[in-house]
Amino acid sequence: MWTYGNPEEREPTGITQGGYSNNIVVDKHFVIKIPESLDLQHAAPLLCAGITTYSPLLKANVKPGDKVGVAGIGGLGHMAIKLAVAKGAQVYAFTTSPKKVEDALSFGAKEAIIVDSLDKLAPYKGKLDYMISTIPAQFDVAAYANVVKPYGSFTQVGMPPGMSLNISAIGLSINRVNFNASLIGGISATRDVVKFCAENKVYPT
């Protein structure tokens, strides 16, 4: 179920109304316990932006010392930076907005690169172990994937208009980078991200 406003035949109104309520009845399988050490205002975003970026990092087995790229520094991107840093990774933030540089560095990124042209990616060619993209628009995927080492992985979580992304097959094949995409995450990983953030004091801002 989407958060809200998504066409859904089962709903009396024809669209989903989301889960923003003081009380709700659900199957216990879907209940996530919030630790007392975690304020609800910090916990709530973890159930969307948090799990959306944590799940790919988990599957990529990001570990201390890994060089991780985060492309797009919005709501998802800032969580990706904080989570990867908390896992001990060296994070390289890529943004087209100069205004996001200070934020990225304050979140713990080792470097923040303003990509006002694709040439700015060239110095990082083949240097990263992994990259997660939160860019919600069409972009040159192969150019960004090129900063990942051969046989490394690139995960797309940003959703462009129309939910479709144009990809250069030859660009990815030349780079030998594994491309995948991810949408939110399962219950087990959601429980993990809540616990991880509580223990490591990773808070959405």
Where are these regions (language model features)?
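Glycine-rich phosphate/adenylate-binding loop and adjacent beta-alpha elements
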Residues: 1-31
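Glycine/charged-rich beta-loop-alpha catalytic/anionic-binding loops adjacent to active sites
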Residues: 30-40, 176
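Short hydrophobic alpha-helical segments of the AMP-binding
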Residues: 57, 80, 84, 172
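Adenosine-nucleotide cofactor-binding segment
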Residues: 64-73, 83-143
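Structural detector of well-ordered beta-strand residues that form the stable sheet scaffold
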Residues: 32, 69, 92, 153-155, ...
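A general structural signal for well-ordered alpha-helical segments in protein cores
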Residues: 31, 50, 128, 141, ...
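Glycine-rich phosphate-binding loop and adjacent beta-alpha segment
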Residues: 87, 135-203
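A glycine-rich, Thr/Ser-enriched phosphate-binding loop motif common to dinucleotide/cofactor-binding enzymes
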Residues: 14-20, 36-59, 71-79
